UniProtKB/Swiss-Prot annotation:
It comes from Mycolicibacterium smegmatis (strain ATCC 700084 / mc(2)155). The gene is sigH. Gene3D superfamilies: 1.10.1740.10, Winged helix-like DNA-binding domain superfamily/Winged helix DNA-binding domain. Belongs to the sigma-70 factor family. ECF subfamily. GO terms for molecular function: DNA binding; sigma factor activity. This is ECF RNA polymerase sigma factor SigH. Residues 1-15 have a biased composition (Basic and acidic residues).
Amino acid sequence: MTDVDRVEPETPPEREETDAELTARFERDAIPLLDQLYGGALRMTRNPADAEDLLQETMVKAYAGFRSFREGTNLKAWLYRILTNTYINSYRKKQRQPSEYPTDEITDWQLASNAEHSSTGLRSAEVEALEALPDTEIKAALQALPEEFRMAVYYADVEGFPYKEIAEIMETPIGTVMSRLHRGRRQLRDLLAGVARDRGFIRGPQLGEPEEVTS
């Protein structure tokens, strides 16, 4: 048998996905994540109108690049990365003023649950009083955090992303994510404690402030 006889037949190229198939796959996999993505957009823009615009632009970009997304990898993290980059590039500089939005759009009780533990991991009487706060107060405290802390807390404590995926979404080292999350949770806890004190749920100095010593 000659070398010519031993030549293997060429493997036929894989059939390219049609536009109809791409659309069906996008609707099946990406569209169900719209509500969660809107929550992230609202946390970034702090304005419902901007959040809707940001989400729409994100989904247009996601659809345009959906052929490059590898099935079996984390679609949610992929979409959040597009959302975050779109916000940074397009909306951060022209952001509208924050406005009120319905309190039932996003539930943030996970934030208080993660923020209400002391450095020893034990719940104190003060932080247990935070459970009396309504979700609107928790939302307001989260919005008061610096952006980099706010988004780290949101991705970890609301969306449940692990550090590695948050680092990919925010395009920062894992160590930076851990630092932002630690500082963000601590600031959130202090803010919530201050609100609880104003509401009469906590007595004494604010968390993080020294007790007054009398002679």
